[in-house]
Amino acid sequence: MLLRYFRLIRINNWIKNVIIFSPLFFAGKISNIVLLQQSLISFISFSFLTSSIYILNDYMDLEHDRAHPSKKNRPLASGKVPIAHAGGMAIVLLIVGLGIISQLSIDTFYVSLSYVVIMVAYCLVFRKMALVDIGIIATGFVIRLYVGSTVTGIPNSMWIIIMTFLLALFIT
């Protein structure tokens, strides 16, 4: 039973949030325990935020997913997780994620909040607009980079910003 909730929040997609550690790694400060701890907390908290967005996206795609050969097995589309449970879980993940991040750094909070706003707009409006949707998804990866930068105080170089965006465009 618990497995369906783990599938709902897409823990397997949390790997995308490893980008948060990039500023720490590229600055050669990965062994700094305090910065590593802050990055780890922001990674977990940001993962809560991304999970809340995945739930919203699954809700928005519900009818389409039910008719899709493989997506029909997703927890919401299959009915294995009630919509009310998923909605409640999304709200809790969002509040907890933003709450923890707000305790780390106000800048990290605002960067994370911008991610939430952009991704909610994506789910509600932009996901059906070709090229715009890809640009927004790629921007989400750059925002992850800024989460790592703001929580550690390590500035991102222009090359890592550009390369992250281009790589995200490529894999999207």
Q: What are the roles of these predicted feature ranges?
A:
Residues 1-66, 80-88, 92:
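Topogenic membrane-insertion module of multi-pass membrane proteins
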Residues 2-6, 11-13, 124, 142, ...:
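C-terminal membrane-associated helical module and adjoining short loops/tails
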Residues 62, 67-112, 158-169:
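Multi-pass membrane catalytic core of lipid/isoprenoid biosynthesis enzymes
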Residues 60-64, 108, 125, 130, ...:
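Membrane-interfacial segments
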Residues 47-59, 117-125, 146, 164-172:
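Transmembrane alpha-helical segments that form the membrane-embedded catalytic/substrate-channel core
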Residues 25-44, 98-110, 145-163:
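Helix-coil boundary and interhelical linker segments in multi-pass alpha-helical membrane proteins
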Residues 130-140:
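Cytoplasmic-side transmembrane-helix entry/capping segments in multi-pass membrane proteins
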Residues 18-22, 40, 44-51, 88-99, ...:
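Generic alpha-helical transmembrane segments of integral inner-membrane proteins
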